[in-house]
Regions:
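Active-site hotspot residues in diverse enzymes, especially metal/ion-binding acidic/histidine motifs
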Residues: 2-425
Length: 425
């Protein structure tokens, strides 16, 4: 199998083939080698940030007429020039190897915010992660097509059971039945609980990514989802607390089950009147029921001991009761309210205190900056495994794999190890 597209080869116009892939970073390939890309994708990327061809040429550092020549197909950029264009256009290099401009990239109506946050212009980081989610999905579909395979569809439930408690029960059973990892129980860490649910969703056919390097603040976005009948995408925020990511993950899965885009935030309004607020409250309730089934919650010794002492909960007792479910004390307390085991007034009075203590504990327990682990988390461990497995089996060559993963060829093996099922996300 050839390792790299060679000068003079014809430009692809159909699906992305293994020999079309070019490396992303310096892996020993001369930077002057032409990058065989689709001109219309170059034009789309430039126009998406409102640059003229001349302005783009100057930012990229080429003659004023060069970008126009690329977009007309008269000339092609070199690898080095394409890397620079990717930086200028704020796009992943992999997007330039799509066969056509992606559609509908900049119309996200689904993202989840902290209480008190207000809608406003997206940050550059949110734009980039949203676009990256679309690109990675397209590339994953290319890999399935190359192997003449269909993405899993186990995440879907049709028809939807009613009421929502039945839907949550069916969803939990469906995901865990096919999950490659068991639930860790009360002795498991927050990372292990998150890892289990991420792996379950990926196995069922949902791509799970993270906002790159935590560059999007949680005050702007906690998570968002892209609904598709085939291979939908959930993006959580890598800067969020581990248990917060877990709840956001299942909240977005609830949106996918309901075939909705969301308008997500973290707040459940008891008196919600607008359709969007009711939808958010409903998705929160479904997520809580998936993670914390009623029977299992009520069977907890800490819960049974307080049937007649509803206001006797302390932070430590809540933490002990919440541990088997991998959720925060605040989320568990809210679940007790929904199940009629704690008064709403007690929850309101303690919520801010418990959130502050939980966030302080999470901050102290955050791990170091392992690049491979963080990159596998951001790209999505399932996506990394999909690409690295295709490379290992020679379905794609090394440079295509490097492009899809945005790494050096020499880094693919260690990144694949970081994406192993049992490694933390």
């Amino acid at each position: 199998m050839p390792e790299l597209s060679v000068p003079g080869m014809s430009r692809h116009t159909g699906t992305l083939t293994p020999s079309d892939g070019l490396l992303v970073q310096d892996v020993g390939v001369p930077a002057s080698i032409p990058a065989i890309v689709e001109p219309s994708v170059l034009r789309w990327a430039r126009e998406s940030i409102d640059l003229t061809p001349v302005a783009a040429s100057r930012k990229i550092g080429v003659p004023d007429d060069r970008v126009a020549a690329w977009e007309s197909g008269e000339e092609v950029p070199t690898i080095a020039q394409l890397r620079k264009a990717a930086d200028v256009y704020k796009r992943s290099l992999a997007v330039f190897f799509l066969a056509a401009p992606p559609a509908g990239f900049d119309t996200l109506r689904d993202f989840r915010r902290h209480e008190g946050a207000t809608a406003g212009p997206w940050s550059q980081g949110l734009h980039e992660d949203y676009r990256r989610a679309h690109v990675q999905r397209d590339l994953a579909l290319e890999l399935y097509e190359l192997e003449d395979a269909e993405p899993p569809s186990g995440w879907q439930i049709s028809p939807l059971p009613s009421p929502d408690d039945a839907l949550a029960s069916a969803a939990r059973q469906r995901l865990l039945a096919g999950a490659p990892l068991p639930l860790p129980g009360g002795s498991g860490t927050a990372y292990e609980h998150l890892n289990t649910w991420v792996a379950a969703l990926e196995t069922a056919g949902v791509m799970v990514l993270a906002a790159s390097g935590g560059r999007v603040p949680t005050s702007e976005m906690r998570a968002f989802s892209l609904y598709f009948d085939v291979l939908p995408v959930i993006v959580v925020n890598g800067a969020d607390a581990t248990r917060g990511r877990l709840f956001s993950l299942l909240h977005e899965y609830a949106h996918l089950l309901l075939h909705t885009g969301g308008l997500c935030d973290t707040v459940t309004d008891a008196g919600a009147t607008s359709p969007d607020r009711r939808l958010e409250a409903r998705c929160n309730a479904i997520a809580a029921a998936i993670l914390m089934p009623q029977a299992a919650v009520l069977a907890q010794p800490e819960v049974q001991a307080r049937v007649n002492a509803r206001a006797s909960w302390t932070y430590s007792s809540l933490a002990a009761a919440a541990a088997p479910f991998g959720v925060s004390t605040e989320a568990f307390l809210r679940r007790l309210v929904d199940l009629g085991r704690v008064d709403p007034g007690f929850y309101s009075a303690r919520r801010e205190e418990y959130l502050a203590r939980y966030e302080d504990e999470e901050a102290k327990s955050q791990g170091g900056g392992d690049w491979y682990r963080n990159t596998a988390r951001d790209l999505g461990k399932g996506y990394v495994r999909l690409v690295s497995d295709a490379y290992r089996r020679r379905v794609i060559d090394s440079y295509t794999a490097a492009t899809y993963l945005n790494v050096k060829v020499s880094q693919i093996s260690r990144l694949a190890q970081a994406a192993a099922l049992r490694n933390a996300v």
